[in-house]
Amino acid sequence: ILYGTGGENLGGSFYAVLLSDLLLGDISSSIVLDTDQNKGYIAPAAICQNTDNGIYDIIIQSYDGLVSKIDGQNFSTIWTYQKSGTESSAEPVIGNFTGDLTPDVLLVLFNGVAPAYNDYFQVMLDGSDGSVQFIDSMGVINFASANAVDLNNDGRDEGIFSVVYFNNGYFNSKVQSVDFVNDTIITLDQVRTGVNIASTPLINDLDNDGLIDLIYCVKYDSLNPMGVKGINVFRHELNSIIPNAGIAWGSYLGNDYDGAYSTSLTPCW
């Protein structure tokens, strides 16, 4: 079991403990994987299998924006990354963005201190060493965790972000795809009036026709981001087939809602 403590203004740690200990009601044997003295842990971990030893590595992110890759065999830290001045409650997303056999990491970061954010960053890290391979600042609101899927079946995943913009006095939402190979950004469906605060899209093949379906939510209210006037749910079928390697990260907590990335990687050379 992987779990975190703390929060926006309360320091905490991220732990691992045996399920059997939890069932016995005693988690005193918990192992500390990482600690943040200032802001604790809200986002769930993501895990990905190490191609060298078959052990699952663990990607965790504190609310203070500190991202750590932990060796699942001995719980040592492999690398860390932190962009100064940012926070995040978005789950790290795993995909094959750089084309080697080590899964990479996609982040959504909020610039500033809650509740007064002034920018949002979309960041892709090389899974081997945590180095920044891509960073952008799309939109005026982006709290939702990302997705990863290979839309053009070239062996590399695109990053999918649900981003809010502000134009002509009202808010609108776009689901946008970042192609890290060609360095291009496209909008996957029409621009929708309204706001998506923190709902991660679903990427799946609902009708089993071999084409990718995109399902996402947008609030009715286009003037107040926190308004409670209801939501619209949209389904859009893309002109993209299910990729040979399968969908990398199709929903919040991944394809099976367990935080695990299980796509088999093959070299892109």
Place the predicted regions along the sequence by residue:
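Acidic/hydrophobic-patterned starts of short beta strands in beta-sheet-rich repeat architectures
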Residues: 1-4, 52-61, 99-109, 153-163, ...
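Short glycine/acidic-enriched loop and turn motifs that connect beta-strands
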Residues: 6-10, 65, 110-116, 164-169, ...
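A detector of repeated loop/turn-to-beta-strand junctions in beta-rich toroidal repeat architectures
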Residues: 11-13, 55, 64, 117-121, ...
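Aromatic (tryptophan-biased) beta-strands that constitute blades/sheets of beta-rich domains
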Residues: 20-38, 76-84, 126, 131-138, ...
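Conserved positions at the start
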Residues: 41-42, 55, 88-89, 102, ...
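Beta-propeller blade termini
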Residues: 43-51, 90-98, 143-152, 199-206
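Loop/turn-rich, solvent-exposed surfaces of beta-rich toroidal or solenoidal domains
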Residues: 140-177, 195-203
